[in-house]
């Protein structure tokens, strides 16, 4: 999949770059209009940067938060890594890149989740407000 995705810039007018295990991710995120990545702590980095994302979960503990943020129009959840095809990623990329208004709306929603200079207390409060309480029999 990585080989195919890394060739995408050859067949599109969009400026698409593939970065793996990047040590300058914050710098790249400031310049990006859309990110494809995993869930987990990257969600909060993307939100504080107001960066829309296509998210592919790579661990079970990323799924629920990703679904929740997807419902809030912060990202588009594509699925778990072993269930997402190159075609799925390509279609989602094309859909968003051809709709600047969707990207802008997602960016606004992301920025509301973690406003600049808000820090951990704000993130924690918002995450807790989005989580549904467990029924007593599951607690």
Please report, for each region that a protein language model flagged, where it lies by residue.
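Nucleotide-activated sugar donor-binding and catalytic core shared by glycosyltransferases
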Residues: 2-139
């Amino acid at each position: 999949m990585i080989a195919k995705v890394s060739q995408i810039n050859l067949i599109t007018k969009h400026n698409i770059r593939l970065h793996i295990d990047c040590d300058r991710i914050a710098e790249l995120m400031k310049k990006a209009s859309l990110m494809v990545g995993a869930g987990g702590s990257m969600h909060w980095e993307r939100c504080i940067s107001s960066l829309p994302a296509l998210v592919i979960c790579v661990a079970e503990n990323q799924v629920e938060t990703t679904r929740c943020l997807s419902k809030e129009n912060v990202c588009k959840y594509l699925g778990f890594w072993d269930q997402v095809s190159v075609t799925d990623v390509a279609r989602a990329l094309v859909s968003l890149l051809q709709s600047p208004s969707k990207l802008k709306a997602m960016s606004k929603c992301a920025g509301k989740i973690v406003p600049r200079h808000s820090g951990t207390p704000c993130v924690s409060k918002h995450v807790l407000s989005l989580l549904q309480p467990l029924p007593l029999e599951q607690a």
